[in-house]
Regions:
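RNase III-family endoribonuclease catalytic core
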Residues: 2-137
Length: 137
């Protein structure tokens, strides 16, 4: 189990709730979606059954939400720009590097349950951010 998994699993529910409140700005009623959002598929590498619970589905939802919110903001912020400009700007704003940076600034690496010994690329924290956005949505 990774250091991050140990930190996450050792958090008391009240402390975890405080951490989530600090990130999302409100007191969550049900922590289960937030815990799921911070559970990477690598945390349980031998459990690959269909329907296994990890953050991938929330990541999918959060990715779409982030794209929509950023697209709408750019649409109204730059009313004279064409679709190509808006698409390029959105791509830069929601790039993996930016999502990883935001996730790091929010402290998500300290809450993520993951086995970091494997090769998961550099997207694991940005993916967790997307999953957290999916949980909020």
């Amino acid at each position: 189990m990774s250091r991050f998994s140990q930190v996450f699993l050792s958090l008391k529910p009240s402390r975890f709730k405080n951490e989530i409140k600090g990130i999302v700005g409100y007191w969550p009623k049900d922590l289960s979606l937030y815990k799921l959002a911070l559970r990477h598929s690598s945390a349980y590498p031998f459990r690959k059954k269909k329907g296994e619970r990890n953050n991938e589905r929330l990541e999918y939802l959060g990715d779409a939400v982030i794209d929509l919110v950023v697209a709408e903001a750019l649409f109204y912020r730059f009313p004279k720009e064409d679709e190509g400009y808006l698409t390029k700007l959105r791509s830069k704003l929601v790039s993996r590097n930016n999502l990883n940076r935001v996730a790091d600034e929010l402290g998500l690496p300290n809450l993520l349950v993951a086995n970091l010994k494997g090769n998961h690329g550099d997207s694991i924290y940005g993916d967790a951010l997307e999953a957290l956005v999916g949980a909020v949505y």
